[in-house]
């Protein structure tokens, strides 16, 4: 999306930005996900490496008002004609939007945050999938829940076809030429996947933490971990499918369960079901068995936990609840003692008699 906006604004795809890992703007420092930096990058290389500094600097020069219209053209901020009322439009911010909503001027920091999908930018998964489909097809495709009859004709996007082809090639490189999505490479002869990885940060990283070393997602509480994102389409040569995967608080913590692998498996299933199921059978033992086995184990574990909780509650209630049991027990003991005394007085004990037992 940002790449298309840059090309549309006249940026040459061969222009290079040197990434040193951080960019100072005023009193603030904006960091790249690669702390040591990527070095000099052109547009395709920046997309493949998911370099934050490249897009920070380019959008700083142009302003985010050049990017927002392209974002809307690709489906962000849109409500689609779908049969449910729970859609959230998200937000594609710009200077006019901020002035209207907050009565505040747009800042350079706002542009930098928005350039990597942070700050005020909000998007839902279906918008991301639509964006992937429009980049792949070059048309203003609309999502539908049920396929029936002939699909409506989608108009071409008001974007340069050469620019779209360039971005598709860069997304091919993300997966197949050493980019960040290499684990999404398809194992289907003659079929390639184009994609873009992403991360949605959900917490603020302080300067003190950066100085001491940013904590890994795996070391954070679940709710503080980043969301992992992935959009893709395939086949690159003649796209048929597009998808968006959002793994909430996934944080890119488990490689073989990360979004690129999920995207690969979904597309493989759509294009070659037998191959996908064979691959699934090979990997399922590492997850604890097939889906039926895993669900049975989870159900048993859940029931076990419920039993333990109920048992603990029963013991607590029995101990804590007020009761007449001590008084009843004392009265019973007194009555038994009196009866025994009377019996002993009335009749001598027999030799060899034994105490009563419960057999």
Q: Where on the chain are the PLM-derived regions?
A:
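Beta-lactam-recognizing serine transpeptidase/beta-lactamase-like catalytic domain environment
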Residues: 1-247, 255, 298-310, 314, ...
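Short beta-strands and strand-coil junctions in structured, solvent-facing domains, enriched
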Residues: 251-253, 272-273
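Short, gly/Ser/Thr-rich active-site loops of penicillin-recognizing serine hydrolases
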Residues: 152-155, 168, 260-332, 337-338, ...
């Amino acid at each position: 999306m940002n790449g298309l906006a840059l090309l549309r604004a006249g940026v040459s795809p061969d222009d290079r930005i040197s990434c040193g890992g951080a960019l100072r703007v005023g009193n603030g420092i904006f960091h790249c996900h690669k702390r040591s930096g990527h070095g000099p990058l052109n547009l395709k290389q920046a997309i493949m490496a998911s370099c934050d500094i490249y897009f920070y600097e380019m959008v700083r020069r142009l302003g985010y008002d050049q990017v927002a219209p392209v974002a809307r053209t690709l489906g962000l901020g849109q409500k689609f004609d779908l049969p449910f009322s729970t859609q959230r439009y998200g937000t594609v911010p710009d200077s006019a939007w901020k002035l209207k909503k907050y009565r505040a001027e747009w800042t350079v920091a706002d542009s930098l945050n928005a350039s990597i999908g942070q700050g005020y930018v909000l998007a839902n998964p279906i918008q991301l999938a639509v964006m992937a489909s429009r980049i792949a097809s070059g048309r203003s495709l609309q999502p539908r829940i049920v396929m029936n009859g002939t699909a409506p004709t989608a108009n071409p996007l008001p974007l340069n076809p050469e620019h779209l082809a360039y971005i598709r090639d860069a997304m091919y490189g993300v997966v197949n030429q050493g980019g960040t999505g290499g684990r999404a490479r398809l194992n289907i002869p003659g079929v390639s996947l184009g994609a873009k990885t992403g991360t949605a940060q959900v917490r603020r990283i302080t300067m003190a933490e950066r100085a001491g070393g940013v904590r890994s997602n795996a070391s954070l509480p679940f709710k503080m971990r980043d969301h992992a994102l992935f959009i893709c389409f395939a086949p690159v040569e003649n796209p048929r499918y597009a998808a968006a995967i959002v793994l909430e608080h996934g944080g890119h913590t488990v490689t073989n369960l990360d979004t690129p692998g999920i995207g690969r498996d979904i597309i493989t299933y759509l294009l070659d079901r037998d191959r996908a199921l064979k691959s699934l059978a090979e990997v399922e033992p590492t997850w604890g068995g097939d889906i039926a086995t895993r669900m049975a184990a989870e159900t048993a574990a859940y029931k076990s936990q419920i039993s333990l909780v109920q048992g603990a509650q029963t013991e607590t209630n029995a101990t804590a609840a007020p009761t007449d049991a001590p008084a009843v027990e004392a009265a019973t003991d007194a009555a038994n003692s009196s009866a025994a005394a009377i019996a002993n007085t009335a009749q001598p004990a027999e030799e060899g008699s034994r105490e009563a037992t419960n057999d």
